[in-house]
């Protein structure tokens, strides 16, 4: 299954400038997925990171991976309307700078999804080069009652 940007926005609540997944090219709900982020010179974070030498902040690469994980989990019928929130990031490594013009391929493999807690392994690539890898943990909460 693939998802375009409009379909993505029906599943997760993120919006510009914080929606960091342009499309999903592979989706296996509850299991795995591959998303794409086209990094442009117009990204708002490049204004201050860094003027004259724009580099995508590493924390936004991990957030993009988390958004792919959220799409995989929140697309399941039992998770519709829930909100995915980070509970942990482990073994995070940044191996390559991501700059304007790069296409970031965001790969997520779910390792656990039980009782509203998800765990996933994420990797972000530019071409065949690994840019970022991390183990992500998150909770799926009801935004109206869980705080």
Curated annotation (Swiss-Prot):
Function statement: Involved in unsaturated fatty acids biosynthesis. Catalyzes the dehydration of short chain beta-hydroxyacyl-ACPs and long chain saturated and unsaturated beta-hydroxyacyl-ACPs.
Family: Belongs to the thioester dehydratase family. FabZ subfamily.
Active site (record annotation): 49
EC code: 4.2.1.59
Catalysed reactions listed for this entry: a (3R)-hydroxyacyl-[ACP] = a (2E)-enoyl-[ACP] + H2O
Organism listed in the record: Alkaliphilus metalliredigens (strain QYMF)
MF (Gene Ontology): (3R)-hydroxyacyl-[acyl-carrier-protein] dehydratase activity
Protein name: 3-hydroxyacyl-[acyl-carrier-protein] dehydratase FabZ
PANTHER family: 3-HYDROXYACYL-[ACYL-CARRIER-PROTEIN] DEHYDRATASE (PTHR30272:SF1)
Cellular location(s): Cytoplasm
Cytoplasm in keyword set: yes
A GO cellular-component term linked to this record: cytoplasm
Signal peptide span: none
Coiled coil (residue ranges): none
GO biological process, one term: fatty acid biosynthetic process
């Amino acid at each position: 299954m693939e998802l375009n940007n409009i379909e993505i926005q029906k599943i997760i609540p993120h919006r510009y400038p914080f929606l960091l997944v342009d499309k999903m090219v592979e989706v296996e709900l509850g299991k795995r997925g591959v998303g794409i982020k086209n990094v442009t010179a117009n990204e708002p974070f490049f204004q201050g990171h860094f003027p004259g030498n724009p580099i995508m902040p590493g924390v936004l690469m991990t957030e993009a991976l988390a958004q792919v994980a959220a799409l995989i989990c929140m697309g399941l019928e039992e998770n519709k309307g829930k909100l995915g929130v980070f509970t942990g990031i482990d073994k995070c490594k940044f191996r390559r700078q991501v700059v304007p013009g790069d296409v970031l391929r965001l790969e997520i493999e779910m390792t656990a999804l039980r009782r509203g807690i998800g765990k996933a392994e994420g990797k972000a690539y530019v071409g065949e080069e690994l840019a970022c890898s991390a183990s992500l943990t998150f909770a799926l909460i009801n935004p109206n009652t869980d705080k």
